[in-house]
Amino acid sequence: MALPSSSLSSQIHTGATTQCIPHFHGSLNAGTSAGKRRSLYLRWGKGPSKIVACAGQDPFSVPTLVKREFPPGFWKDHVIESLMPSYKVAPSDEKRIETLITEIKNMFRSMGYGETNPSAYDTAWVARIPAVDGSEKPQFPETLEWILQNQLKDGSWGEEFYFLAYDRILATLACIITLTIWQTGDTQVQKGIEFFKTQAGKIEEEADSHRPSGFEIVFPAMLKEAKALGLALPYELPFIQQIIEKREAKLQRLPPDLLYALPTTLLYSLEGLQEIVDWEKIMKLQSKDGSFLSSPASTAAVFMRTGNKKCLEFLNFVLKKFGNHVPCHYPLDLFERLWAVDTVERLGIDHHFKEEIKDALDYVYSHWDERGIGWARENPVPDIDDTAMGLRILRLHGYNVSSDVLKTFRDENGEFFCFLGQTQRGVTDMLNVNRCSHVAFPGETIMEEAKLCTERYLRNALEDGGASDKWALKKNIRGEVEYALKYPWHRSMPRLEARSYIENYGPNDVWLGKTMYMMPNISNEKYLELAKLDFNRVQFFHRQELQDIRRWWNSSGFSQLGFTRERVAEIYFSPASFLFEPEFATCRAVYTKTSNFTVILDDLYDAHGTLDNLKLFSESVKRWDLSLVDQMPQDMKICFKGFYNTFNEIAEEGRKRQGRDVLSYIQKVWEVQLEAYTKEAEWSAVRYVPSYDEYIGNASVSIALGTVVLISALFTGEILTDDILSKIGRDSRFLYLMGLTGRLVNDTKTYQAERGQGEVASAVQCYMKDHPEISEEEALKHVYTIMDNALDELNREFVNNRDVPDTCRRLVFETARIMQLFYMDGDGLTLSHNMEIKEHVKNCLFQPVA
């Protein structure tokens, strides 16, 4: 119904309440090109409001809508051509990729109890054990021989290619004591003593965070042994006295019965507590596998004191695996599997290993405990590092795990710790808790608490210039932390994370237990080589696809449209950043073309076309009638012809893939979309500010994410039944949450600029209308809260919607995430030429990794 241009009041009754609008004399200037004015075509649906034009009242002025002036697109053809690298996928690259995939699959399939390197320290303790037959020989002579054969050139024992003074000094001290006990290797002992004398002082130069676990317990105890054996060591060095004092202080803080009350990390260092341990009581805390917290050294010390057969069985088990040496702890089966899965996912190569990942996670889940897990399946002491990693990965893969497991690791002050009784936290464990906290479900307050606590800790670590870690020596842990804080889960797209982690990943990273150790199934060159080759290969295909999209854009005449934003590369970046696998090329193309039309038509309906012409456009889509184009202005002719031809082609391809006609489905999707655009145009024309609920009901559709997803889903490689389509359809909670979160993040970053251009309806403004007593700042805060809660619910829908094919679930969820990225700091689509999005596009599509 058109409002008449008379001086008389008119009333349109559509509900129970009345709102005043001003008179309109003539037609409303839409601020478009000369001679074009927006007619007041109004279509009112059902609702509680009625709008009236009230004579003599002017409750708000009707501003001239400001013509949209968009920055020109940055990614023109000549820019894209100038950035095209010389890289092409060579046959040798394809062959190498296949070889690496096979080797890594075999790596996953061969995972047992954990692969790791020798620990000279633990091997020395096992070598101390006298033969059980009473002969004056070692029970494990092969371990003693290993010590004799593996002294380094500088006289130390330890990891040859990674010098850590704490680690070298501790291992060297253990080895020279063992050799002295067995009265062998005099030359090695003297070289070891010389190393100790010349290098011990370097410990003072190392960060406290690099001090191995339990060092202040076992090192002073071994020094006491060395002194009793007459070894000439510099016992009076200041740092040695400081370590002894730390040991005494720690033991004084230890409640007398804590050692025996429940399993703690003290079980890991019993060799350093021999003078205070009640050996009968301690046996109650022995693990099922016979070890004490998987530590060969601790277990060896207990065996020498008790002769316990299960201890001996454990040591025999470890030596059967490793031959003539032992690691610093074993097994490491849960740790190895979780971190291997996390590594291939972060490097972006997980799509090659779906079966292997499932097998690994099935194994972990079979040993999941509601109190948490440790690094091994029979480890009685859970830690927050493995638990948080397990909670996040298992949840995202659809396993039923509760966030309540984190309560095990929260103290009375609300702070989170790694182990029971621990006073120091590490960067890597807090980083993993932080990453975990972002996959929260609604109402999980423990996840919110974990997020706030770990963000505070990690930001402080960065500000202090540290970000060094007590559990790992990584290539660039600082870079990992910076990425996680800047791009948390809901704005971290897979290709961007892969790019970042390829740069931060260390194939030679080491971990810190009681000694330094390596995990070759977690850190290795094969993962990195495959990640680089695969990234560059996928990027090459993406560049070719983008060129095809550019040709489509130009041949359709869209470059002639002066009223809209040309953002072809930025829009293509969206699906390429998450649905990146080569087999989804058609889906990416459909996603990009559909998205481009949502931008064109949004700009058309928002501020360019008259309402009469918009009605004609909508009717043309509804009737799918090209003949109506003759009644349209030239720019709208270009729009509709391109629209008509493109979606006819898409529908034909969809028919082939789905085995049924999909054109009517696509039409209906677009009808709903254009209705939402039209309603916004009507509101804008009369300066109508709806209630928040009324606004969101329409705006969650007008954001157009649903239209993009519902059409693109036809090309995910799955046959989509009506039942499946209903689960991601307009009435589904899943799709609604995607649209809601996309709309809210858009509004929070653009409402002020759009208000200056004459727009009156946004989530913030509509909420303020419902609650006139609150400030704009309070309204904005409330909208953010709504969005955060909706993102939590979106997590749950994504994880639990297992009736929906994985690729369709990804399509919905990742589309919500890309919106969080684009509107992270502002309007990343409109202003992408001078924002970080430009760098993301470049890194994702044009810049190969070296």
UniProtKB/Swiss-Prot annotation:
Pfam families: Terpene_synth, Terpene_synth_C. One of its GO terms (cellular component) is chloroplast. Binds 3 Mg(2+) ions per subunit. Keywords: Chloroplast, Isomerase, Lyase, Magnesium, Metal-binding, Multifunctional enzyme, Plastid, Transit peptide. A motif (DXDD motif) lies at residues 383-386. Induction: By methyl jasmonate. The keyword Lyase applies. It comes from the Eukaryota. Belongs to the terpene synthase family. Tpsd subfamily. This is Bifunctional levopimaradiene synthase, chloroplastic. The gene is LPS.
